Amino acid sequence: LWGGARASAVERDAAGAVREVTFVRDGAEQRVRCRHLIVADGVRSELGRRLGRKWHRGEVYGIAARSYWRSPRAREEWIHSHLELRDADGVVQPGYGWIFPLGDAPVGGDPDAAAARLRGGADAGADAPGAGGSAAGWVNLGCGALSTAARPAKVNTKKLLSHYAAARSEAWTLGEEQHVTSAMLPMGGAVSGVAGPNWALIGDAAACVNPLNGEGIDYALETAEQVVALICAAGGDGGDLTAAWPALLNEHYGEAFLLARTLARALTHPRFLPAVGPLGLRGPAARVIMPAAARLMGNLVTDEDRDLVARVWRAAGAVTKAARAGSPLWAPAEVAPAS
């Protein structure tokens, strides 16, 4: 395991198969030959871009900022979401805020020290900013908004993050802000060029991010398992992933992602959320709507579920997929973005 290295270049043969990847760490260069390459380098996916990934920004995408804070509530077992996200002027934003308790998980710093911390090594904790005897652990606090090329979100996410953190500071006894970052997130499979003869993009790199809440951890774990199973099932050289991997992603997530993208697109209309939000969050229907929304946003509807919410979700997904058959969904690179 060579932690903290950056993949800087790939060498491909005439058929497009990756034969060698060049990694750089602390100025040292290492070339690694490979039979298969699984790319999991996040939403920006620099290696994915080198391999031909294209992001279709006509579809809904997220803009988000996150930070880490010391908090005595870091060991809580619940993730907190705030769906009515307002800016400093009180204007409702098409997004939400979150607080993920992380316990004593390592935050930032040197990758080797972080790995040692996870292993419980003697130098554990050396990487964490602010470490030094504090009983408080860490929480991930962030916020995000939805956007499209036609209706870009007009919000400074870092300013919104500061406002959101200030609003939650007393309840969470937040310490000093650490490691603020922001990014744009392709969502719901709105990318093309995610596979080649012996390589595949997974997780955030393949836009396997829920368009309704920006969540992608479970999709990252699932797609990692799925691509390994696909390669192993083919035997021998692992088969050609160029069409097989997008087809598998489409089978598992296509209907749900297209439906979620369609619903998320509605949230980018300026008048939609102020009109509908209060009904779902505080109206008489909230007791029904909010549990169902949390379930759908959490990717908790399985193929085995037969209740009303699951049936309606699957039926709506099938209808949406048929109606938006031309929308980019891990599509060939020549497919144009949705208008």
Residue ranges and their predicted role:
Residues 1-172:
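Predominantly flavin-linked oxidoreductase catalytic cores and closely associated redox partners
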Residues 6, 51, 223-230, 263:
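Short alpha-helical scaffold segments that flank and stabilize functional sites
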Residues 28, 65, 79, 181-183, ...:
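Glycine-rich, flexible loop/turn motifs
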Residues 48, 54, 217, 223, ...:
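Residues in and immediately flanking transmembrane alpha helices
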Residues 60, 219-222, 271:
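Generic recognition of short, well-ordered alpha-helical interface segments
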Residues 106-133, 147-230, 236-242:
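FAD/FMN-dependent oxidoreductases across multiple families
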Residues 229-339:
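C-terminal helical "tail/cap" subdomain of flavin- and related membrane-associated enzymes
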